[in-house]
Amino acid sequence: MRLITKMFLAACCSLVVATPALGQNTDAESVDKQSTQEETKTMPKPEQFLGKCVGKWQGTVKTWFEPGKLVDESKVSGEIVSLLNGNFFRHTYEGSMKGKPRHGEETLAMNGITKKFQICWFDDFHMSGAILISEGDSIERGFSVSGKYDWAPGKPQGGWRTDYELKDSDHLTITAYNIMPNGEEAKAVETVYERVKEYPINSPSQSSPSNQP
């Protein structure tokens, strides 16, 4: 796998708290508590997370070749589908990078024994005929997985961390970080998705023409 500027080229080419009177609860506290409870209810359990991501998505993807230096921002479209009775999921996407077409695919799963998330990823821009295998744990709104890749013969491997986060049911962010051999991290790729709303079967735009004049 190539790093930008060697390592980066292969990877990316990557209180203020008001105290109420004793024994009293402010309206704001009640609202915050209710909001937190509602948010907790809507968050999918780790084993349900991938299923909540199924659907068609569109948005933007940003790429950094070096820390803090944004080199590309472009449109991206993707789809996540369920495979083999929901035991596996496939994420396919297409977009562009500096005007050139870019395509990629991920196979995702949650290991039923270890309860860890696992991803197998390949991409026609970031890879050099290699497959990146990553594994990790759930986080508050999704999961975070890490893997290693080769960027030059005889050199220490680089690391790659990917975070999947559902902001809500219609907004998914996938952020990848390049990890140098010394442990330093830098944001490499950020995909911000919005769910594509598809017409319901019985919507007026797809219903049969009226028989009445």
Task: Show the residue positions of the predicted features.
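Hydrophobic small-molecule pocket/channel-lining residues, especially in calycin-type beta-barrels
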Residues: Q24-P213
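Bacterial N-terminal signal peptides that target proteins for export
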Residues: M1-L9
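Bacterial N-terminal signal peptides
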Residues: L9-A18
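Sec/Tat signal peptide C-region and signal peptidase I cleavage site
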Residues: T19-G23
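Low-complexity, intrinsically disordered short peptide segments enriched in small/polar/basic residues
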Residues: M1, C13-S14, A28
